[in-house]
Amino acid sequence: MLILTRRVGETLMIGDEVTVTVLGVKGNQVRIGVNAPKEVSVHREEIYMRIQAEKENGTQGTGNF
């Protein structure tokens, strides 16, 4: 795992098209912004895991995450 230190307003690049920007830090919470092309899915881990579980169970959710 790559570990980076960023300050509020600083950005990191993932490949050529995805950026992750630190928007704010408040206590133990960090707000980040992600810019990615439409064809790149971006989800919180718990949402991604739910999507994967639904795929495995053959169900489709409403898509409202």
UniProtKB/Swiss-Prot annotation:
Q: Which residues cross the membrane?
A: none
Note whether Cytoplasm occurs among the keywords.
Answer: yes
In Gene Ontology terms, what is one molecular function of this protein? mRNA 5'-UTR binding
One GO process term, biological-process aspect? negative regulation of translational initiation
Q: What's the short name of a Pfam family annotated to this entry?
A: CsrA
Which InterPro entries does the record match to this protein? CsrA, CsrA_sf
Location, primary (coarse class): cytoplasm
Give the subcellular location: Cytoplasm
Q: Which family does it belong to?
A: Belongs to the CsrA/RsmA family.
Function of the protein: A key translational regulator that binds mRNA to regulate translation initiation and/or mRNA stability. Mediates global changes in gene expression, shifting from rapid growth to stress survival by linking envelope stress, the stringent response and the catabolite repression systems. Usually binds in the 5'-UTR; binding at or near the Shine-Dalgarno sequence prevents ribosome-binding, repressing translation, binding elsewhere in the 5'-UTR can activate translation and/or stabilize the mRNA. Its function is antagonized by small RNA(s).
What is the protein's quaternary organization? Homodimer; the beta-strands of each monomer intercalate to form a hydrophobic core, while the alpha-helices form wings that extend away from the core.
- Protein name per Swiss-Prot or TrEMBL: Translational regulator CsrA
To which species is this protein native? Photobacterium profundum (strain SS9)
The gene that this protein is the product of is: csrA
